[in-house]
Regions:
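Catalytic Walker B motif of ABC-type/P-loop ATPase nucleotide-binding domains
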Residues: 182-185
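Conserved ABC ATPase signature
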Residues: 157-161, 165
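ABC ATPase NBD Q-loop/coupling interface
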Residues: 80-98
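Conserved ABC ATPase "signature" region
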Residues: 87, 134-152
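A short, proline-enriched helix->beta-strand linker immediately N-terminal to the Walker B motif
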Residues: 176-180
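Helix-to-loop junction immediately C-terminal to a conserved catalytic motif
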Residues: 71
Length: 271
């Protein structure tokens, strides 16, 4: 059973303590606002190695903003973002650049270059950031494409394949530099339930094969439950629950119950 910690910032709520393990990323009391809109309000969360963690919460609650903080694309107004023991905003520009190489990122649409075929899209980071020979790049790229089931589509343009295939190509590109951390920003967006389930299976398979820290942001409750080792719930810019995946579905927190059950009754409204 996970220990439960009282946190005054949660206005009486409780949250499950972080999972045991080596923390690769830590967010400490992070605040971020855009204009007068406060997105993150003292967020504290950490992510451990060799696990798949999913962060969930309503639209506009700061999940994608969290990802941008972790990869160093946004600087917090207050607080610290620690990656591999280093505060990334106390690091130099060159050090942040090197840290980003340890990340793989899968965006909602795959973020592929439309003028490049699948092979060249996946090869792009290797050509940009390494001095590998083309023959070595070719072998490496085809291995990744085989892993995601796209080796026969390497020559096709993104417009010539399905949305699910574009996401798998983006996944292959995200893994091409052998990252220690992989971030997924709503990877199931636009996919039907079957393709979502298959993508979840692929994520688990690749994590089992390559290890590392995988962090997913999604609204898909069934995918979060089946794909994750841990689930964190964010509401109003704060962490309201964090623990083993099944624990979230047994939470006594009113918001967590409402969100995961998809019910209209509860503290979460239309605004």
């Amino acid at each position: 059973m996970d220990a439960v910690l009282a946190d005054p910032a949660l206005n009486g709520r409780h949250m499950v303590s972080p999972p045991a393990g080596h923390a690769t990323m830590q967010v400490r009391n992070v605040h971020k606002k855009f204009g007068d809109f406060k997105v993150l309000q003292g967020l504290n969360i950490e992510f451990v190695d060799d696990a798949i963690t999913t962060v969930m919460g309503p639209s506009g609650t700061g999940k994608s903003v969290l990802l941008k903080h972790l990869v160093g694309l946004l600087e917090p107004d207050e607080g610290e973002v620690i990656v591999f023991g280093q505060d990334i905003w106390k690091a130099s520009e060159d050090e942040r650049y090197e840290l980003r190489k340890r990340f793989g990122v899968l965006f909602q649409d795959g973020a592929l270059f439309g003028s490049m075929n699948i092979f060249d899209n996946v090869a792009f980071p290797l050509r940009k950031h390494t001095d590998m020979a083309e023959s070595e790049i070719g072998d490496f790229v085809m291995t990744r494409l085989q892993e995601v089931g796209l080796d026969r589509s390497a020559h096709k343009l993104p417009t010539e394949v399905s949305g699910g295939m574009r996401k798998r190509a983006g996944f292959a590109r995200g893994l091409i530099m052998n990252p220690d951390i992989v971030l997924f920003d709503e990877p199931d967006s636009g996919l039907d339930p079957v393709r979502t389930s298959l993508l979840c299976d692929l994520i688990q398979q690749m994590h089992e094969q390559h290890g590392g820290t995988y962090l997913l942001v999604t609204h898909n409750i069934s995918a979060a439950r089946s794909c994750s080792d841990y689930i964190g719930m964010i509401w109003q810019g704060q962490l309201v629950h964090y623990g083993a995946a099944d624990d979230a579905f047994n939470s006594d927190d009113e918001f967590v119950r409402q969100f995961l059950a998809g019910e209209s009754a509860g503290p979460l409204g239309m605004d």
